[in-house]
Amino acid sequence: QWERHWTVNVMAGVRLSRAYLPAMADRGWGRAIFISSESAFNIPAEMIHYGVSKTADVALARGLAKRMAGTGVTVNSVLPGPTLSAGMAAMLKPVQEKTGKPIETVAADFVTKHRPSSIIRRASTVEEVANMVVYIASPLASATTGGALRVDGGVVDSLA
């Protein structure tokens, strides 16, 4: 799984950046957005390979942001925490069927058990993560670059 995660989570970003950043720089405007994970800073013991690849993803974005300095191109990472996506809903479906609880409640129970540092004590919604992406893709975020922007519900216990 190490090689697969490295290829998907890191090398895909390298390849896409090589393909698109030069043209963005030539135009004097662009946005590169990496979807990372709170696992980049909160590496799960059961998924070290995933956490390491997401940490590399954040480092890649930061380095590319420095490389793009002065071009009008920003590069950022978005770090979702537990998110009630279709994938999470599918993973939790057996529990939902067994308990009869709404999927949001099952997801909140999962977050409470597996990510007890969560401040919001529930899974984020896909829309909440998308809102961050929309913002950093917009002209409003022209001074936001090289960032690791968390949409993690406070899961990562850090002041930075």
Feature locations, PLM:
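Active-site loop-to-helix junction immediately N-terminal to the catalytic Tyr of the SDR YXXXK motif
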Residues: 43-51, 63
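A conserved structural motif in NAD(P)-dependent oxidoreductases
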Residues: 117-129
